[in-house]
Amino acid sequence: MLEDLRANSWSLRPCCMVLAYRVAHFCSVWRKKNVLNNLWAAPLLVLYRIITECFFGYEIQAAATIGRRFTIHHGYAVVINKNVVAGDDFTIRHGVTIGNRGADNMACPHIGNGVELGANVIILGDITLGNNVTVGAGSVVLDSVPDNALVVGEKARVKVIK
């Protein structure tokens, strides 16, 4: 956790966000190991959701797996699904959404080490972002990305004209 705080330059909001996520992730992992752990873990997880979603406006689900030195810049409107796996040195900015493509497909992205996401990036589906990938602001990523790549642009295209 100390590495996370250093990676966030000791800035109050990002440090609080990462620290809260780390505690919630610990609770999420340990409550599955023994049913008695729910006595202390479940109330903390409920409190985590209330504080993060209602008061701070972001949703990094406790079951998401994020590696060391997780950095957040301007962490407003961030949504990370519980099935997301991200490596070390993962950096995000405001408006980032990482998750599945819908109720019929619950698979989520696997994100490598050293990945940096710009503002308002959307990453959806069963894809892999390689190591040392940078995704530019406003990009929509629906396909896997190889290592050491720079990804920019939107994926939207017209299907039907009304």
UniProtKB/Swiss-Prot annotation:
GO terms for cellular component: cytoplasm. Pfam families: Hexapep (PF00132). One of its GO terms (molecular function) is acetyltransferase activity. It is an enzyme of class 2 (transferase). Keywords: Acyltransferase, Lipopolysaccharide biosynthesis, Repeat, Transferase. One of its GO terms (biological process) is colanic acid biosynthetic process. Gene3D superfamilies: Hexapeptide repeat proteins. SUPFAM superfamilies: Trimeric LpxA-like enzymes. Pathway: Slime biogenesis; slime polysaccharide biosynthesis. Its EC number is 2.3.1.-. Belongs to the transferase hexapeptide repeat family. This is Putative colanic acid biosynthesis acetyltransferase WcaB. It comes from Escherichia coli (strain K12). The lineage of its organism: Bacteria, Pseudomonadati, Pseudomonadota, Gammaproteobacteria, Enterobacterales.
